Curated annotation (Swiss-Prot):
<comment type="pathway">
    <text>Nitrogen metabolism; urea degradation; CO(2) and NH(3) from urea (urease route): step 1/1.</text>
</comment>
<dbReference type="GO" id="GO:0043419">
    <property type="term" value="P:urea catabolic process"/>
</dbReference>
<dbReference type="GO" id="GO:0009039">
    <property type="term" value="F:urease activity"/>
</dbReference>
<dbReference type="InterPro" id="IPR050069">
    <property type="entry name" value="Urease_subunit"/>
</dbReference>
<dbReference type="GO" id="GO:0005737">
    <property type="term" value="C:cytoplasm"/>
</dbReference>
<dbReference type="InterPro" id="IPR002026">
    <property type="entry name" value="Urease_gamma/gamma-beta_su"/>
</dbReference>
<dbReference type="InterPro" id="IPR036463">
    <property type="entry name" value="Urease_gamma_sf"/>
</dbReference>
<comment type="subunit">
    <text>Heterotrimer of UreA (gamma), UreB (beta) and UreC (alpha) subunits. Three heterotrimers associate to form the active enzyme.</text>
</comment>
<keyword id="KW-0378">Hydrolase</keyword>
<protein>
    <recommendedName>
        <fullName>Urease subunit gamma</fullName>
        <ecNumber>3.5.1.5</ecNumber>
    </recommendedName>
</protein>
<comment type="similarity">
    <text>Belongs to the urease gamma subunit family.</text>
</comment>
<dbReference type="GO" id="GO:0016151">
    <property type="term" value="F:nickel cation binding"/>
</dbReference>
<dbReference type="InterPro" id="IPR012010">
    <property type="entry name" value="Urease_gamma"/>
</dbReference>
<keyword id="KW-0963">Cytoplasm</keyword>
<dbReference type="Pfam" id="PF00547">
    <property type="entry name" value="Urease_gamma"/>
</dbReference>
Amino acid sequence: MDLSPREKDKLLIFTAGLVAERRLARGVKLNYPEAMAYISAALLEGARDGQTVAELMHFGTTLLSREQVMEGVPEMIPEIQIEATFPDGTKLVTVHQPIA
């Protein structure tokens, strides 16, 4: 399989997001990289499913709560920016204060 660097990045985000999802399902609090991967993977999948940038900006704030992450993680993530592929091209999605 010959993947471009961008495709490799997306695959890495998805894989890390899947690990974070499994840990969350077991009740494990997520650390910084896991929280970033979990939210980023969900945003990429949402774009692939046809959600708009505005919908994803809101959706990104509903994925994790303070109770689901380790202490200090919400303050470490004031925003998340990710380039997602939409039906009409690639766009930057920015989610402010993703962990409420």
